[in-house]
Every structure is written in structure tokens, then in C-alpha cells.
Design a protein with these regions (language model features):
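C-terminal segment of classical bacterial N-terminal signal peptides
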Residues: 15-25
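Generic structural motif
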Residues: 51-53, 66, 91-93, 141, ...
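Bacterial N-terminal signal peptides that target proteins for export
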Residues: 1-11
């Protein structure tokens, strides 16, 4: 089922059609720096994006990630590297908008395709009830030497 969704998303992306219910993209790109100069095509870069948690008011996650340039990158055909960092912060009084799962599986809060097929970047939220904190995990669905790259950030709840 998951692969079918990726195939459908890829077909619609190539056709230039948006589909409701597919993974959300960054709500705001904060900035970017070029890392590799390419004379005739877009440069490779590191982008900084902000994602606001849809179920937790006033929690924003800032993600830096590598983005492949070149003509294939510009057309969305290149695979972005699985390297990223995350920092989530309370930017005001934290309010839960709905029930936050407390199980060990967590909840995928954001998801973004990072290649045309079968590779996603995901941000999952976990609730540590003992310490009263939200833990955000960014990870890639692509396995590197048997496990995905990942990074975490913790937001204390008062």
C-alpha cells in the first residue's frame, strides 16, 4: 500500500497535479546555502525548513537537509542525500490540539518524498509521559548499511 502511494504521488508529480492527503511539504523554507557550484544548472545546497506541528500549537521544528542540484535535481528526478539535522522548539505557550499517542510507535507528523520513488524523509513525534516531553525524530526510509540516518530533538512541556 505504501509503495502504491509513492507511485501515484510520482505520477501526479510528473503530471504537475497536486493530490490532497499526500505527505505535507515544508511549511516555510527559511533559507539555503550552496555547497557545490554547477556552471549550467542549479547548485547542490543545504536548505533550512520550518515545520509547525499540526497537533501541538506553538511547536516548530527546524530541519536542515541536503538537496541535490543539477538538471535532475531541478526536475525532481535526483535522489536527495539522507543527511539532516533537526531542532524543535516551543515558540509560545504549548497547547495540544488533539490526543497525542503515548504508544511506543509514535506518530508521523510530516513526510516528504526525497526521490522520485520509494524514499521519504519523515518526522515522527513521540510523547514521553514520564518526563513530560515531546521527542521529534527525523529519519529516512532509505536504509544505509542496514539502518536509516536519524536525528532527534526534545521539547519539554510545562
Amino acid at each position: 500500500m505504501m509503495r502504491f502511494r509513492h507511485v501515484v504521488a510520482a505520477i501526479f508529480a510528473l503530471a504537475g497535479v497536486g493530490v490532497t492527503g499526500l505527505p505535507a511539504v515544508a511549511q516555510e523554507q527559511i533559507g539555503a546555502v550552496s555547497t557545490t557550484f554547477r556552471l549550467m544548472s542549479p547548485n547542490d545546497k543545504v536548505v533550512i525548513e520550518r515545520y509547525d506541528d499540526p497537533k501541538v500549537e506553538n511547536v516548530s521544528c527546524y530541519l536542515s537537509r541536503a538537496e541535490t542540484g543539477g538538471w535532475s535535481g531541478a526536475m525532481g528526478l535526483a535522489e536527495d542525500p539522507s543527511r539532516f539535522s533537526i531542532a524543535c522548539r516551543a515558540v509560545g505557550p504549548v497547547t495540544m490540539k488533539g490526543k497525542i499517542p503515548t504508544d511506543k510507535k509514535g506518530e508521523v507528523v510530516f513526510s516528504e518524498d526525497t526521490s522520485i520513488m520509494f524514499k521519504e524523509l519523515r518526522i515522527s513525534r513521540f510523547y514521553d509521559t514520564q518526563k513530560n516531553v515531546l521527542v521529534y525524530l527525523v529519519w529516512s526510509t532509505k536504509l544505509i548499511d542496514g539502518s536509516p540516518y536519524n536525528s532527534i530533538s526534545v521539547v519539554p512541556l510545562n
